[in-house]
Amino acid sequence: MKIGIEAQRIFRKNKHGMDYVVLQEIKELQQMDTTNEYYVFVKPGEDRCVESTKNVHVIELNCPTYPLWEQWALPHAAKKYGVDILHCTSNTAPIWCNIPLVLTLHDIIFLEPRDKQNHSLYQNMGWFYRRLDVPRILDKCRRIITVSNFEMENIISKLNIPRERMAMIYNGYNDWFKPLDDKNDIYKRYIPEEGYFFFLGNTDPKKNTERTLVAYSKYLKLSDVKRKLLMADLDKEYLDGIIERNQIDNIRENIVMPGYIVNNDLPYIYNKAFAFLYTSLRESFGIPLLEAMACGTPVITSNTSSMPEIAGEDAILVNPESSDEITEMMLRLEKDQDFYEQQKQIGLERAKLFSWRKTAEKLLKLYQEVYSEIYQQ
């Protein structure tokens, strides 16, 4: 069986969620499957995070734009190398492609009503491209994979896809996310002192950055400790806008924004955090939830979409539209030591249910099922 895997962006330096998912899937398949042939199609970049092996061939395709790479370069290369199945891993796929397709559709947020907040040019272009592409490829996909039961039911309901063509495969997390020796000081590259709140906010409205910062402002007014807030992926201009709109100038001197945090440093960041805030309005899965829990860091997360499914019913679940609820749980973790220790243990046990090996095993089984349906009838 020859399997093509679209992994366009995994060689870029600053990777994001979907990039890490396909990268870990490839690495696990590379270790566990020496029988089938894999052709991994990527765009050239500075981070060569996976190399070719005997049966895994990394093919670099140079093309100026994402749509052109996916719609023209990818199907031509897949045909050239004679793949039996082409797995497109990041929500979209080539419209004109005669090779049987498997699609990972992480979410359908792009089909849901948009809020009135400003979006970046990159976000707008991605939104329009997905809205154009996805409706045109769904009927051509032999299987559509998604990453949580919440998202699967959402996709089936809104896109009217037969259940038998859907597959739910949970993501995993890397095994270096674990409790670490207290002596490490790598966190100091980003923030001077440990015991901070950690938040991966950005400009995407679904990340709920503005409301979370309002909650943090309320926390600072009520707390005797006044812990710092470490935030990644947010620039000063965007922060200034939030502060001015909400009149929360008291947060300025307590927020640390180092910019992009290298993935290899994240285990140290989680370990030295007092708690992790994952208060999104909407997520299809939430790998950072698992990473924090696996490090023994208490998590405050939302009671919406997939987050209760991933974090578990015993996790700290709040209404993400209520800054008061977020503040309340920040303070409770700080004041109630028994509750704090209980949440650490709950997270450690919950994280054990997920792994990239389990993800890859289910993915390989799906490839085999699709191949049998097509070629062994």
Model regions and ranges:
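Carbohydrate transferase catalytic cores enriched for Leloir-type hexosyltransferases
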Residues: M1-Q377
